[in-house]
Structures are given as structure tokens and as C-alpha cells.
Amino acid sequence: MNPDVEVKTYRMFVDASNIRGLIREYDFIIDGTDNFPAKFLINDACVLEKKPFSHAGIIRFKGQLMTYVPGQGPCYRCVFKNPPPKDAVPTCKQAGVIGAMGGVIGSLQAMEAIKYLIGVGDLLTGYLLTYDALTMEFHKIKLPKDTHKCPVCGDNPTILEPIDYEQEICEETAGRFATRDEQ
């Protein structure tokens, strides 16, 4: 263990009123949340505070991640625009999450943070990395950045503060997953 690393825990709900203050003191943010509203909240706060971060998402046997560095590629909102409408995407409770997927994708996020912090290697800035555990295939997809239209990192931003969206959080779903018939 690195003796210079300090770990802080926060027993609080993170929302638009407190997220900017929470992330301000950190050098790199890792998004390990389980819902779209939280992902947009983290993205918007990181962009507004000029903080680099790694986004990740998992469901069933699939995962994805991307890294945002201010001024060096698209943010999460550039790629995904807005949270999907309620019921448009299955929740973790409906679809299930394989615990090992969190380990695989979380380890990749940790590597992104380490590379950024020590200044080595190529980050996933401008790319979306997807992983399918059923086929054991990774795909690195180049992402275009449309700075003219993004409402948070674009040339004329309209989102000037983080937004709280209605959210449904995964409840007690670790290890549950849909059967092959439901996929």
C-alpha cells in the first residue's frame, strides 16, 4: 500500500447540491454508479469543475467504459445526450448484473486513473471501450466530439449547474441475472 494515499468515506446521498464540493479536492473521479441520473450528475459536475473522470457501466455480461479529460475529447453527455426515458432500458434489478463484470470493468477504470495520475500510456479519451464476457471480445470505438452542440462542454453551454434527475437505483441485485431465454 502507498502510505501517501488517504481514503475518505462519505455517508451521504450525493446530489446536485453537494457534488461539486465533493469532487473539487480530487485529481481524478471514478464513476462506479448504477444508474443513468447519477452518471449524468457526475459527468456534468466533472465537466463544470474541469475534473477528469472514468465512466463505466455494466449489465448482465456486458460492460463499457470511457475516460473524459477536460479539453481532450467528448464527455459522457456528448455521447449519450440525456438520460433515457424511464423503462427504456432495463434496470439492474430487471436484467441482472454479474459481480465479476464489476471487477473486470472496475480494474480497467483503476488502470485509467493510475495512467492519468502518473502520466503514462494512452487513456480512453475519445473512445468507448466495450466488453462482452460471453464472447470475450473487447471493442474500442472512436467517439466524435461535437463541441458545438453539447449542453455542458460545448462552445455555448446551457447546463451551468449539475441536474438531479429522477432515479431508480439497483436494489439487492448483485449476482442476479436474466436467464438465456430472457436475453
Where are these regions (language model features)?
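Adenine nucleotide-associated cytosolic modules
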Residues: 1-183
